[in-house]
Curated annotation (Swiss-Prot):
Name of the featured protein: V-type ATP synthase alpha chain
Binding site for ATP: 238-245
Reactions this protein catalyses: ATP + H2O + 4 H(+)(in) = ADP + phosphate + 5 H(+)(out)
Cellular-component GO terms for this entry: proton-transporting ATP synthase complex
PANTHER family, per database record: H(+)-TRANSPORTING TWO-SECTOR ATPASE, V-TYPE PROTON ATPASE CATALYTIC SUBUNIT A
Native source organism of the sequence: Borreliella burgdorferi (strain ATCC 35210 / DSM 4680 / CIP 102532 / B31)
Designated gene of the protein: atpA
The EC number(s) this enzyme carries: 7.1.2.2
Keyword ATP-binding recorded: yes
Keyword ATP-binding: yes
Length: 575
């Protein structure tokens, strides 16, 4: 029989409950008020009193309201039908909620995440008599562009023998597709879906590998200078309006992955609506179909209850780990982890815990680390390799990278793509600072070349600061040429037009080709009589390179521009 209790105190979305019976941490419970059941989660136990965070608005909850505990942790349902869906943080399908409740979400309405009536064409890959363990494949269904493997549930701890398996055909997620038997002779029915607690990492794999293979984003500044590896982690901190959301959307569109999961936790509703409107209309460059076919969106806007933000981050990473277990490459984009940290700060304050820096909880670093540590590249039991790459945007107030959430994130990620107000105001997009950003991963271009090019950016910035004080006349022609070359590298290679059909996504082959051209310009010595002549020449080169960026790779126009560029360089270079 489930444990019962009653409300003895309410403080915002924190409810204190007096319980009669046993309760466990993170257990889900329902507060019964005004004819509705409001979902909540146990976050602290003190004797016979329990503190729970409610995932809904707590308006109307009063002392004496009855509470029922479920004896279950907060879980997600895993199975075919997750892709193309838009969920809230508790995995309620928002399109279904809209049909049922209208434009405004009602409290206490919880729907099943997966469609129980839809039939999936199941093709078996195992047979009666096979010995299986948790995470092994029984067969697959086609979900959008993905071979969705039907697996033995991850919570099964022993080895089992398949005693029954259905023939190929159409089945719903609740229909029995196999029966497995353990060593004691007990039989277990297997369906296409099962539940898994969101705060428990999925560990049904043979070993974890060190991320080394680059995950191509087709954004030049990232792939060349600050690469991300498959199974790696990266963060995108930046002030408001610097282009974090656009950069994440471009990455999700062009990244070399099989499935994209977007966790919009605490973002403005307008940005989430933009994502929901754009994604179904965008074409996946790899398949020619809608981008939504390989995307799952979990959104908790800033207007939704605070507690559900935390749940949305864990829901997203659990779904990512589930698809990783199929041997797929997953990209999870969390936008923005600052809002999630603010939700933790709010709960910590209500629990009257000793605050850390800027009133964030003292355990902020360990919570952020435990989230990013769930990224990784793994070898599955059958030898396949799957990965989850995690990218979190951070919204520090005023673009201050010294604040606690950014600092806690920097300690655990493998790449840092810092967006700056200075670059976004100058309309240099993506506004990733080439001087402040870094990456620990290997990119698509030789590291010696990129370090040489980056040294030009550093020198160019120093000369630019000097020119602000003494003017152009106060520096030598050689220094002025270094400054012009650094500006050429910035405008022709680091900057990219996300709204141009050709320049929005640049293949690794084209990146190598264009970088070699720019690298040769940086290495070449030129001689000019004065600064005006130098500026005119570099501007001519810049225009030529920009035109090449907007031309199809190696077509007639591209080749013509490249030939003209070569003649210009040969005309002015010092032999």
């Amino acid at each position: 029989m489930n444990t019962k209790g009653k409300v003895v105190g309410v403080n915002g979305n924190l409810v204190t409950i007096e319980v009669e019976g046993s309760v466990s941490m993170n257990e889900v419970l329902f507060v019964k008020t005004a004819g509705r059941n409001l979902k909540a989660e146990v976050i602290r136990i003190r004797g016979n009193e329990v503190d729970a965070q409610v995932f809904e608005l707590t308006k109307g909850i009063s002392v004496g309201d009855l509470v029922e505990f479920t004896d279950k942790l907060l879980t997600v349902e895993l199975g075919p039908g997750l892709l193309t869906q838009v969920y809230d943080g508790l995995q309620n399908p928002l399109p279904e909620l809209a049909i049922q409740c209208g434009f405004f979400l009602e409290r206490g309405v919880y729907l099943r995440p997966l469609n129980k009536d839809k039939k999936w064409n199941f093709k078996k890959t195992s047979k009666v008599g096979d010995i299986v363990i948790a995470g092994d494949f029984l067969g697959f269904v086609i979900e959008g562009t993905v071979h969705h493997q039907i697996m033995i549930p991850f919570y099964k701890r022993d080895s089992y023998k398949i005693v029954e398996i259905v023939s190929d055909g159409d089945y719903s997620i609740d229909e029995q597709i196999a029966v497995i038997e353990d060593d004691s002779g007990m039989r277990h029915n297997i369906t296409m879906s099962f539940h898994w607690p969101v705060k428990v990492p999925i560990t049904n794999y043979k070993e974890r590998l060190i991320p080394s293979e680059p995950m191509l984003t087709q954004t030049r500044i990232i792939d060349t200078f600050f690469p991300v590896a498959k199974g790696g982690t990266f963060c995108i901190p930046g002030p408001f309006g610097a282009g974090k959301t656009v950069l994440q959307q471009v990455t999700s569109r062009n990244a070399d992955v099989d499935v994209v999961i977007i966790a919009a936790c605490g973002e403005r509703a307008g940005e989430v609506v933009e994502t929901l409107k754009e994604f179904p209309e965008l074409m996946d460059p790899k398949t020619g179909k809608s981008l939504m076919d390989r995307t799952c969106i979990i959104c908790n806007t800033s207007s939704m209850p605070v507690a559900a933000r935390e749940a949305s981050v864990y829901t997203a990473i659990t779904i990512g780990e589930y698809y990783r277990q199929m041997g797929l490459d997953i990209l999870l984009l969390a936008d923005s982890t600052s809002r999630w940290a603010q939700a933790m700060r709010e709960m910590s304050g209500r629990l009257e815990e000793i605050p850390g820096e800027e009133a964030f909880p003292a355990y902020l670093e360990s919570v952020i680390a435990s989230f990013y540590e769930r990224a990784g590249i793994v070898v599955l039991n059958n030898g396949d390799i799957g990965s989850v790459t995690v990218g979190g945007s951070v919204s520090p107030a005023g673009g201050n990278f010294e604040e606690p959430v950014t600092q806690a994130t920097l300690k655990v990620v493998g790449a840092f793509h810092g967006l700056t107000r200075e670059r976004s105001d100058a309309r240099k997009f993506p506004a990733i600072s080439p001087l402040e950003s870094w990456s620990k991963y290997k990119g698509v271009i030789d590291q010696k070349k990129t370090e040489y090019a980056r040294s030009f950016l550093v020198k160019g910035n120093e000369i630019n600061q000097m020119m602000k004080v003494v003017g152009e006349e106060g520096i030598s022609n050689d220094d002025f040429l270094i400054y012009l070359k650094s500006e050429l590298l910035d405008s022709c290679y680091l900057q990219q037009n996300s709204f141009d059909s050709i320049d929005a996504a640049v293949s690794s082959e084209r990146q190598n080709y264009m970088f070699d051209i720019v690298y040769n310009i940086l290495k070449t010595n030129f001689e000019f009589s004065d600064k005006l002549q130098a500026r005119d020449f570099i501007n001519e080169l810049r225009q030529n390179l920009l035109d090449m960026n907007l031309s199809s790779f190696k077509d007639h126009k591209f080749n013509k521009l490249e030939h003209a560029l070569g003649e210009l360089i040969n005309f002015k270079k010092v032999i």
